């Protein structure tokens, strides 16, 4: 019998305590325990939630086999329960596609992104912020497939969505850095030098002018830092890392 007492919010709240400490070992144990509970209780929503979290955890830790097993398990569950057109399932398709992208399976990745995109376009308003995440992640796979024009189109569409939500402006910085990587992949670093420089300038301008230096901003700084370092701007890389550290420490 399905147990209706399981709270997704409480599960994620407890999980975040492990993740904030980078305690991935106990985060995994916690999630596997909830996976067993959800299967025993036939709580499909909780099972899908937990499998999504586990696939993300395994992706971050580079554990390909376990990540793929979670993807296959959650896709099978969605199929069994007839949830193919559900918006929540679209998010699962997106997460699964990201796993396949991370482990160099772009064809499998793009197929799932296309499924997610079709559901989002049918179910959500065109300026729903979830589109920004879809477009950004899908574009990364399109770059792997050397479908550069489509990738840049999605990056521009992601920016258009994010611009509707000023509090998420730092995500545009991430998009510009993704575009720098994309134009390098398309043309090579020498030919693309001027375009790369322009994308980096745009990203830096956003990061410097964003007013709310909170935990979200710190996360974006950390994510962007290595890209600036990759392109030789070691000073700004270190500045972003230090900025994030100060925010996390509350100074």
Label every PLM stretch briefly.
Residues 2, 40-43, 80-84, 122-126, ...:
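Short coil/turn linkers that connect adjacent helices within long alpha-helical scaffolds
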Residues 7, 40, 47, 82, ...:
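Residues that mark the junctions of alpha-helical repeat units in TPR/alpha-solenoid scaffolds
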Residues 12-20, 48-60, 87-102, 129-144, ...:
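Conserved alpha-helical positions within TPR/SEL1-like repeat arrays
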Residues 35-37, 73-80, 117-122, 159-164, ...:
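Amphipathic alpha-helical segments of tetratricopeptide repeats
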Residues 82, 97, 124, 165-166, ...:
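Short coil/turn linking the two alpha-helices of tandem helical-hairpin repeats
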């Amino acid at each position: 019998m399905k147990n209706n007492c399981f709270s997704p919010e409480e599960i994620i709240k407890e999980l975040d305590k492990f993740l904030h400490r980078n305690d991935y070992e106990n985060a995994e144990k916690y999630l596997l325990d909830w996976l067993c509970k959800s299967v025993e209780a036939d709580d499909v929503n909780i099972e899908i939630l937990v499998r999504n979290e586990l696939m993300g955890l395994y992706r971050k830790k580079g554990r390909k086999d376990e990540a793929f097993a979670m993807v296959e398990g959650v896709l099978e569950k969605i199929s069994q329960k007839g949830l193919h057109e559900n918006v929540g399932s679209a998010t699962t398709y997106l997460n699964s596609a990201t796993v396949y992208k991370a482990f160099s399976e772009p064809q499998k990745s793009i197929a799932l992104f296309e499924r997610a995109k079709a559901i989002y376009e049918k179910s959500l308003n065109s300026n729903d912020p979830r589109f920004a995440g879809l477009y950004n992640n899908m574009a990364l796979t399109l770059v792997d497939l050397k479908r550069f024009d489509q990738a840049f189109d999605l990056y521009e569409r992601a920016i258009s969505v994010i611009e509707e939500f000023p509090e998420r402006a730092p995500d545009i910085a991430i998009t510009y850095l993704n575009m720098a990587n994309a134009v390098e992949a398309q043309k090579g670093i020498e030919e693309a030098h001027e375009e790369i420089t322009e994308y980096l300038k745009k990203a830096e301008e956003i990061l410097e002018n964003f007013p709310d230096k909170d935990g979200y901003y710190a996360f974006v700084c950390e994510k962007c830092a290595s890209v600036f370092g990759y392109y030789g701007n070691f000073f700004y890389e270190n500045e972003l890392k230090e900025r994030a550290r100060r925010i996390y420490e509350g100074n």
